[in-house]
Structure formats: structure tokens, C-alpha cells
């Protein structure tokens, strides 16, 4: 009987152990979730950041991680102290460090969406750091496939990253800059954003400003170069014509001074009228050159205005730019 009771007890003990072990496993699996949830309870976003969070249409998981990394909008000096580690003048819009997110507080109305996009970008860094190696590996092929198809958008400089960093950057950039992703990737990002396309809209909203500006500058430069060539050709044509005309006028005047050089009044008048006609035609060439020069100067002025505008935008997004008092 004793043996039977002991056996029963062992069965009971074994069962209890199994239950306990399952409980430990469950806690282990959810520890990060619980930790993020608890940390997030202490998050007190500003009104602006709260609006940004709402605009991203985060899922429960996305909102939990967002709150846990406590994104903050930072002004220039404080942002540079936290996010800029060198004297590089490269524009840095945000950073994820020590499981916190910091976003450069860019308020330019022309660049609407840039803070939302940056917040989403840095959030995905936090998400990626929470992913298990196996989950990352499952996405590797898809991320590389999308990159191959979108190098013009994502930039070939990504190839300069080391493999691990490259995959993380692809994960973050593709999730915030590319629409119409493979279904498996879309489903993955849907765990964070209810509408990943909406996040990409924020990216396109501000990046379009720079792309339009770049296109405008290229178009203006083409017009400037074409006019420059036309002015050069027309100027040479005018100078050659003026040289020949002046020579012929001098010959005509010398002939007019010489008795019997012109055989008749008709010949005199005919040659004189021909010179006057040529002079008028050359004057039209001169006016045409002036018109080209006016157009050229107009395009140059417009080009310079756009350059200044572009520099101002770059200063706006670049926290390393030193603002000097005028």
C-alpha cells in the first residue's frame, strides 16, 4: 500500500512538475510582452507625440512596443547629444538607442509626415530587436527580393552595410517606404501597423518635396545648358556677320568717296539698300540673342532660388547645421 501511495504521489508530483514547467515556459515566452506593457504604462507622451502615435494606426502589439520605447520629440541640441555621435553633416532624423526612440522635431509645414515616418522607422528598429533569430531568418529572402526590385527607391548605399545591419535596415526601410510588398511581408508588418500603406504615404509626402525639387533643378539645368549653347552659336553668328557687314560698309563708303566708283545711281542705291537690309537682319539677330539671354538669366535666377530653397530644407532636417544670428 505504501508503495502504491508513493507511486500515486510520484504521479501527482510529476503532474505538478509538468504544470509548473509549462507555467515557467509561458512566463518566459511572455516576459518581453509583459515588460513592454509595464514600461509603457509609465509613458506620458506630449500632445504632439500622442497625435503621431494615433496617426500611425498601430495594432495592439505596435502600440505596446511604441509605448515601451517612449518616443520623444527632441530639439536640436538635446537631439544631437543623444543621436549624433560624430561630426558628420549627414542628416539624422531620429535614432533608436538603449531601447528608446528619439525623433528630431522638424516643424516645417512643407515637410508634413516626416516626424510620423521617422517615428515609424525607429519603431521598426525596436520591433526588429525584439524578433527571434529564426523569425529574422524567415524574412531574409523576402527582404533581399524587395530590395533588388526597389534599389532606385531604397538606394544602393544599403549594400555598404554589413549583412546583419543590412537586413535590419532593409526591414525598417521596406516597412516604411515600399508599398505592394509580398503577402508574407505585408502580413508581418500588419502585426505592427493596421495600414502599412498609410505609413508609406507619410514617407512619400515629405520625400516628394525633395524629389520634385531635384527634378525642377534638373529640368532648369537642361534649359540653361540648351540656351547657353544657343547663345554661343548665335553670338558667333552675329560677330561673323557684323565683321563682314562692317567690312562691306567700309568698302561701300570708300567707293562712295571715289569718283566714278559706282557706275550708276541705281548701282549705288541698290548696294546701299542691300547693306541697310543686312544691317536690319543683323539687328534682329542681336535682338534674338538678347531674348535668349533674358530667358537664360530668368532660368538661372529660378535655378538659384530653388537651390536656396533646397539648402533651406536641408538645414531644416539636418540637426548638425549651425544656426547663426543674422
Can you say where each PLM-predicted feature lies in the sequence?
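Alpha-helical transmembrane signal-anchor/signal-peptide segments
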Residues: 34-48
Amino acid at each position: 500500500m505504501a508503495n502504491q501511495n508513493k507511486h500515486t504521489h510520484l504521479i501527482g508530483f510529476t503532474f505538478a512538475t509538468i504544470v509548473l514547467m509549462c507555467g515557467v515556459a509561458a512566463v518566459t515566452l511572455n516576459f518581453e510582452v509583459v515588460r513592454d506593457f509595464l514600461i509603457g504604462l509609465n509613458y506620458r507622451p506630449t500632445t504632439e507625440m500622442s497625435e503621431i502615435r494615433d496617426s500611425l494606426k498601430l495594432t495592439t502589439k505596435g502600440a505596446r512596443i511604441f509605448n515601451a520605447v517612449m518616443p520623444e520629440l527632441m530639439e536640436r541640441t538635446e537631439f544631437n547629444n543623444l543621436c549624433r555621435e560624430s561630426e558628420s553633416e549627414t542628416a539624422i532624423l531620429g535614432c533608436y538607442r538603449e531601447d528608446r526612440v528619439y525623433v528630431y522635431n522638424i516643424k516645417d509645414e512643407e515637410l508634413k509626415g516626416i516626424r510620423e515616418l521617422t517615428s515609424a522607422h525607429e519603431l521598426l528598429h525596436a520591433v526588429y530587436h525584439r524578433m527571434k533569430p529564426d523569425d529574422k531568418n524567415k524574412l531574409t529572402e523576402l527582404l533581399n527580393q524587395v530590395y533588388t526590385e526597389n534599389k532606385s527607391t531604397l538606394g544602393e548605399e544599403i549594400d555598404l552595410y554589413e549583412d546583419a545591419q543590412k537586413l535590419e535596415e532593409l526591414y525598417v526601410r521596406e516597412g516604411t517606404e515600399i508599398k505592394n510588398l509580398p503577402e508574407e511581408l505585408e502580413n508581418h508588418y500588419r502585426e505592427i501597423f493596421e495600414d502599412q500603406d498609410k505609413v508609406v504615404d507619410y514617407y512619400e509626402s515629405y520625400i516628394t518635396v525633395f524629389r520634385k525639387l531635384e527634378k525642377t533643378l534638373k529640368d532648369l539645368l537642361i534649359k540653361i545648358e540648351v540656351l547657353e549653347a544657343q547663345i554661343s552659336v548665335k553670338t558667333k553668328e552675329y560677330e561673323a556677320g557684323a565683321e563682314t557687314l562692317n567690312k562691306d560698309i567700309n568698302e561701300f563708303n570708300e567707293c562712295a568717296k571715289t569718283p566714278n566708283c559706282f557706275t550708276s545711281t541705281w548701282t549705288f542705291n541698290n548696294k546701299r539698300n542691300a547693306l541697310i537690309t543686312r544691317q536690319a537682319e543683323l539687328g534682329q539677330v542681336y535682338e534674338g540673342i538678347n531674348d535668349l539671354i533674358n530667358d537664360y538669366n530668368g532660368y538661372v535666377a529660378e535655378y538659384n532660388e530653388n537651390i536656396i530653397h533646397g539648402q533651406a530644407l536641408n538645414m531644416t532636417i539636418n540637426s548638425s547645421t549651425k544656426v547663426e544670428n543674422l
